[in-house]
Amino acid sequence: MAKRFFEAYNETPDGTQCHRKAYITTALGGLCGLISSAYSITHNPADSPLEAVARVGRFTFTAAAIGAMFGLTTCVSAQVREKPDDPLNYFIGGCAGGLTLGARTHSYGTAAIGCVYMGTAAALFKMGKLEGWELFATPKV
């Protein structure tokens, strides 16, 4: 399923169709949040069903917001800078996602660390895409 999201994201060039890319990154972020909330509830059971639902919502919507900020910021940065295939656009988008996480947790430290780590991971992802690295390798039989 994640592979399908990445393929849909890569169908259009960077800096175009920002609404579509934001939708895809929001969905991918929400999926990651849903998976992480399932692990959280499995390994640390909630005291009540209401607490479990609240935890799922908190994880899912936070991750979806991070994905939305990444998608919008990356696309707008590519349009403003007029350099659609630059890894710096992805660093800026990842940094915006990290700042969103910091705002959600009310922590400057989380925002700073999230900016650096998410920005670096996103820039490396873009560099790998430009150089032909395989994120989902096909098995060689």
Curated annotation (Swiss-Prot):
This is NADH dehydrogenase [ubiquinone] 1 alpha subcomplex subunit 11. It comes from Rattus norvegicus. Keywords: Acetylation, Electron transport, Membrane, Mitochondrion, Mitochondrion inner membrane, Respiratory chain, Transmembrane, Transmembrane helix, Transport. It is found in: Mitochondrion inner membrane. The gene is Ndufa11. GO terms for cellular component: mitochondrial inner membrane; mitochondrion; respiratory chain complex I. The modification N-acetylalanine is found at A2. Its main location: mitochondrion. The keyword Transport applies. Belongs to the complex I NDUFA11 subunit family. One of its GO terms (biological process) is mitochondrial electron transport, NADH to ubiquinone. InterPro entries: NDUFA11. Accessory subunit of the mitochondrial membrane respiratory chain NADH dehydrogenase (Complex I), that is believed not to be involved in catalysis. Complex I functions in the transfer of electrons from NADH to the respiratory chain. The immediate electron acceptor for the enzyme is believed to be ubiquinone. Complex I is composed of 45 different subunits. The lineage of its organism: Eukaryota, Metazoa, Chordata, Craniata, Vertebrata. Pfam families: Tim17. The chain crosses the membrane at residues 21-43, 58-80. It is a multi-pass membrane protein.
